[in-house]
Amino acid sequence: MSKRDYYEVLGVARTAGEGELKSAFRKLAMAYHPDRNPGDKEAEIKFKEVNEAYQTLSDGQKRAAYDRFGHAAFSQGAGGPGGPGFGADFGDFMSDIFDTFFGDARAGGAAGARGGRAGGRERGADLRYNLEITLEEAFTGKTETIRLPTSVTCEVCAGSGAKAGSKPRTCPTCGGYGRVRAAQGFFAIERTCPNCHGRGEIIDDPCTACGGAGRVTRERTLSVNVPAGVDDGLRIRLAGEGESGLRGGPAGDLYIFLSIKPHPFFQRDGADLFCRVPISMVTAALSGEITVPVIDGSHTTVRIPAGTQTNKQFRLKGKGMPVLRSRDVGDLYIQVFVETPQNLTKRQRELLQEFDQHGSQADNHPESAGFFSRVKEFFDGLSGSGRA
């Protein structure tokens, strides 16, 4: 069965802390526990999946490896990180969970087998690879060569895990099901078979090349086509490029998760780009031209009209990002802000003071004049109301 992303399984963000992981695990383990869902195979699978995800993400080293390589970091053997059984921390939660099950408890009998046979064909796990690209690369598209470790079928034993001339035998403990059920007080607990570790079969004479796992780890090189117009967080699926299946099962898929590096000039909103550009006080007052960058590496000229104010926006049509799988292209918006001069010389100060003395407040600064006029009217109105 294909493995989902562990963070997705627990329903938490990749930045989730220990407390958030523990809370999510507790909630899901209670929801999918077999004693609350008797005979529900889907709940049984999810219960096992939740436990495996928590055992990985609650361990610092395993979590770091998983964040970098996904399921490929633990590709030796079936069942994921730490094996398919229950980890030590799981027992700490079970007492709390069992308290909530008391009303639904079912008296258990002797150990017994349950579930489908584990020894059949099994699809390989899906893999995740995080790829970071620049905004320019998202604009043009690119072909990226990646290298990743992954599990492939052992060529020596053809995936059986057994040495040439021998073959696995059915596990006598679980009868080939891979799981056993045992009574514990009022509760019946299902767990991975301790004898075959969930495989449903025993390999008496394991293959020397893979140690009985049926798969070996190899580093593969793949070419990934990143189309123009991709956005941050986009997922690219490469079918059949995940881990090899077990016992003749199909391979899983490889998912490329894209992230785009922050750009020093441009901010992106869909297919549109935004760029803040400083202009001088003189250019803003008298008009002029400025040269601005474009995402394709070129430059273009923007005409600044006289009297331009801070945050004035100019639209450059068709200078933004391409729309993914479309001929449409976004726009580039240039937002200017007027830079107040600093470290003025004596003569510059005199010129500015002369300008201020010879100008009309209403003509030169209509916004300021209008604002202070409205303030005066407001307070005059308050004074008139007080006298009345």
UniProtKB/Swiss-Prot annotation:
Residue ranges occupied by any J domain in the UniProt entry: 5-70
Which terms under GO biological process does the entry name? chaperone cofactor-dependent protein refolding; DNA replication; protein refolding; response to heat
Q: What Pfam families does UniProt report for this protein, alphabetically?
A: DnaJ, DnaJ_C, DnaJ_CXXCXGXG
Q: What family does this chain come from, according to its entry?
A: Belongs to the DnaJ family.
Quote the record's binding site residues for Zn(2+) 2: C171, C174, C193, C196
Kindly give the Gene3D superfamilies that the UniProt entry links to this protein: DnaJ domain, Heat shock protein DnaJ, cysteine-rich domain, Urease metallochaperone UreE, N-terminal domain
Q: What is its main location?
A: cytoplasm
Q: Describe its function.
A: Participates actively in the response to hyperosmotic and heat shock by preventing the aggregation of stress-denatured proteins and by disaggregating proteins, also in an autonomous, DnaK-independent fashion. Unfolded proteins bind initially to DnaJ; upon interaction with the DnaJ-bound protein, DnaK hydrolyzes its bound ATP, resulting in the formation of a stable complex. GrpE releases ADP from DnaK; ATP binding to DnaK triggers the release of the substrate protein, thus completing the reaction cycle.
**Family matches, as NCBIfam families:** DnaJ_bact, PRK10767.1
Q: Where are the zinc fingers (CR-type)?
A: 141-219
Recorded protein name is: Chaperone protein DnaJ
